[in-house]
UniProtKB/Swiss-Prot annotation:
GO terms for molecular function: rRNA binding; structural constituent of ribosome. Belongs to the universal ribosomal protein uS19 family. It comes from the Bacteria. This is Small ribosomal subunit protein uS19. SUPFAM superfamilies: Ribosomal protein S19.
Length: 91
């Protein structure tokens, strides 16, 4: 179930201020954030946002196709190492 249209998309206030500040200054430096739940807005296109995955900040370059998605979708938190093969021969 999605968020109500009456409320609008969620975006952290600090992240929104940083993006607006960079847009006004025409600056495209990396923005570091821990807000994985923030929705990507059209004003973020072209910015590189470093999203925290629990260990490090993963740089995410925002494109037009990402608008409407959450930042956390593009910074995976788990690494799959693969299933262990059974040893042949046994005892």
């Amino acid at each position: 179930m999605g968020r109500s249209l009456k409320k609008g998309p969620f975006i952290a206030d600090s992240l929104l201020r940083k993006v607006e500040k960079q847009n006004a200054a025409d600056d495209k430096s990396v923005i570091k954030t821990w807000s994985r739940a923030s929705t990507i807005l059209p004003m973020m296109i072209g910015h590189t946002i470093a999203v925290h995955n629990g260990k490090t900040h993963v740089p995410v370059f925002v494109t037009e196709q990402m608008v409407g998605h959450k930042l956390g979708e593009f910074a995976p938190t788990r690494t799959f190492k693969g299933h262990i093969k059974d040893k042949k021969g046994g005892r």
